[in-house]
Amino acid sequence: MKLGIIGAGKWGSALHFALSKKNDVYITSRHYHDLKNFVSLEEILRLEYLILVLPAQVIGPWLEKHPLRKDHKVLLASKGIDIKKKKFLNEILQQFIPQEHLAVLSGPSFAAEVQKGLPTAVVVSSSNEILAKTYAQMFPDFMKAYVDDDVVGAEIAGAYKNVIAIASGICDGLKLGNNARAALLARGLVEMERFASHFGARMRTFLGLSGAGDLFLTASSTLSRNYRVGLGLALGKDLQRILNDLGEVAEGVYTVEAIIEIAKEHSIYVPIAREVYEIIHGKNPKLSIIHLLERNGDD
């Protein structure tokens, strides 16, 4: 199968490595021109099957500048919410291609481990079962791809877990212990599902790879950029300094802004996202996390 990857950051490069095991994979990027099978964007867009791996906040403007054809098939491998439009990325994409031509990639998958060929399991979600299976079959043996149809659940899980990962990093940075982190993650998973169910997502999505799997990975390892943002905030570092030191995009910083706005509009209770938002905007991290752990309620 021939397919094109748009976006050559760490995740795009890792997918290029993995998918090249079974397919003719071409990749394009503004910055990295020395990659194997690098071609121009014009050449990529002549292909039918694409994988979009751009930063979440770039996707909307990029699509407006480079509209896709109606017959393009797209696997969305980015995780985030458009902060400007307050829309999920699948909604942005459906302005350019039919819903049945869109699939979403989710699940616990650090780029560094995929790049090493380590065992990984992901989920390809689409309302079009044939499309989901087509993309799933492109993955190599070391990267098992399951098929599902809960596009909304997969996308929200992938975006929201970055916010919970920031909270987890704060918790660990404050040295509050494993018990506290476990409580935070359990409540975080409930919060993610509560938010997503408002938009039609299914609970089972959050109990599998797309939800619990991706959350537990991202919220417990220094390989996670969002977790490292939380660690930095716990140490009292300035957010901009943290992001500069990372040298990469930490989507949770932007996603939390969108979640707060969407939750407010739809009256959805999102206490962890709210505290992360307030910490990013200057609230004392220790007071915020302790307040979360001490609050009453079933969430």
Swiss-Prot record:
Coiled-coil portions: none
Example GO BP: glycerol-3-phosphate biosynthetic process
Keywords, comma-separated and alphabetical: Cytoplasm, Lipid biosynthesis, Lipid metabolism, NAD, NADP, Nucleotide-binding, Oxidoreductase, Phospholipid biosynthesis, Phospholipid metabolism
Class of this enzyme: oxidoreductase
Entry-linked Gene3D superfamilies: N-(1-d-carboxylethyl)-l-norvaline Dehydrogenase, domain 2, NAD(P)-binding Rossmann-like Domain
Highest rank taxon of the organism: Bacteria
Substrates-to-products reaction catalysed: sn-glycerol 3-phosphate + NAD(+) = dihydroxyacetone phosphate + NADH + H(+); sn-glycerol 3-phosphate + NADP(+) = dihydroxyacetone phosphate + NADPH + H(+)
Pathway annotation: Membrane lipid metabolism; glycerophospholipid metabolism
PROSITE patterns referenced in this protein's UniProt entry, alphabetically: NAD_G3PDH
Positions with a binding annotation for sn-glycerol 3-phosphate: K79, G107, S109, K161, D214, S224, R225, N226
SUPFAM superfamilies, per the entry: 6-phosphogluconate dehydrogenase C-terminal domain-like, NAD(P)-binding Rossmann-fold domains
GO cellular component, one term: cytosol
Enzyme Commission number(s) of this protein: 1.1.1.94
Short name of any one Pfam family annotated for the protein: NAD_Gly3P_dh_N
Keyword Signal annotated: no
Positions bound to NADPH: W11, R30, H31, K79, A111, R225, V249, E251
Compartments, as annotated in UniProt: Cytoplasm
GO molecular function, one term: glycerol-3-phosphate dehydrogenase [NAD(P)+] activity
Main location: cytoplasm
UniProt-listed HAMAP family: NAD_Glyc3P_dehydrog (MF_00394)
PANTHER family: GLYCEROL-3-PHOSPHATE DEHYDROGENASE, GLYCEROL-3-PHOSPHATE DEHYDROGENASE [NAD(+)] 2, CHLOROPLASTIC
Described function: Catalyzes the reduction of the glycolytic intermediate dihydroxyacetone phosphate (DHAP) to sn-glycerol 3-phosphate (G3P), the key precursor for phospholipid synthesis.
The name this protein goes by in its record: Glycerol-3-phosphate dehydrogenase [NAD(P)+]
Organism annotation: Nitratiruptor sp. (strain SB155-2)
Gene name tied to this protein: gpsA
